[in-house]
């Protein structure tokens, strides 16, 4: 052929393609190769040697081109995660905007009877030394409307009348607490017990 090479070893290697000469032989299975690097790679199939490790997951490979192909899998996975995170971010911001508009559309009396999961701090119109307990989770207003108003009113009255130990307070009572009305009639010792 008319190909030219700048180095003699490249010419020698190329001539073996035309002649079919394979001077490098595996001593284990007697298979012949035209290039020494191909023999070296082949011997790894017998020894199990895998000197090329993936920098991301640590998986090992006998050939560098296998590692390179494998690394592309991680790059595709990374691209998918970035795309997914971007779509989740866009979705969560639109949900947050919807939630805040829904939370502001209810009047304060309905919000007291049917609290939403949106965390809101209400200041009490009346001073009270016994704040009402805060609930960590509430049903959404649409779910709460399935309960009868008598039940919801009873639950609200119970929640605002009796403090619960160990519960963090995020809401101040809009209703004057029953305990605050009774503090003047109890002695300090009785108040500590309650």
Curated annotation (Swiss-Prot):
A Gene Ontology biological process term: circadian regulation of gene expression
Pfam families the record matches: DUF3432, zf-C2H2
KW Membrane (keyword) present: no
Record keywords, A-Z: Activator, Biological rhythms, Cytoplasm, DNA-binding, Metal-binding, Nucleus, Repeat, Transcription, Transcription regulation, Zinc, Zinc-finger
Matches recorded under InterPro entries: EGR1_C, Znf_C2H2_sf, Znf_C2H2_type
Site for Interaction with DNA, residues: 3, 7, 13, 31, 35, 59, 63, 69
Cellular component terms (Gene Ontology): cytoplasm; nucleoplasm; nucleus
ZnF (C2H2-type) ranges: 1-18, 24-46, 52-74
Cell compartments where the protein resides: Nucleus; Cytoplasm
GO molecular function: DNA binding; DNA-binding transcription factor activity; DNA-binding transcription factor activity, RNA polymerase II-specific; double-stranded methylated DNA binding; hemi-methylated DNA-binding; histone acetyltransferase binding; promoter-specific chromatin binding; RNA polymerase II cis-regulatory region sequence-specific DNA binding
Family recorded in the similarity comment: Belongs to the EGR C2H2-type zinc-finger protein family.
Biological role stated in the UniProt entry: Transcriptional regulator. Recognizes and binds to the DNA sequence 5'-GCG(T/G)GGGCG-3'(EGR-site) in the promoter region of target genes. Binds double-stranded target DNA, irrespective of the cytosine methylation status. Regulates the transcription of numerous target genes, and thereby plays an important role in regulating the response to growth factors, DNA damage, and ischemia. Plays a role in the regulation of cell survival, proliferation and cell death. Mediates responses to ischemia and hypoxia; regulates the expression of proteins that are involved in inflammatory processes.
Domain statement: Binds to DNA motifs with the sequence 5'-GCG(T/G)GGGCG-3' via its C2H2-type zinc fingers. The first, most N-terminal zinc finger binds to the 3'-GCG motif, the middle zinc finger interacts with the central TGG motif, and the C-terminal zinc finger binds to the 5'-GCG motif. Binds double-stranded target DNA, irrespective of the cytosine methylation status. Has reduced affinity for target DNA where the cytosines have been oxidized to 5-hydroxymethylcytosine. Does not bind target DNA where the cytosines have been oxidized to 5-formylcytosine or 5-carboxylcytosine.
Matches recorded under PANTHER family: EARLY GROWTH RESPONSE PROTEIN 1 (PTHR23235:SF42), KRUEPPEL-LIKE TRANSCRIPTION FACTOR (PTHR23235)
Protein name in UniProt: Early growth response protein 1
Gene encoding the protein: EGR1
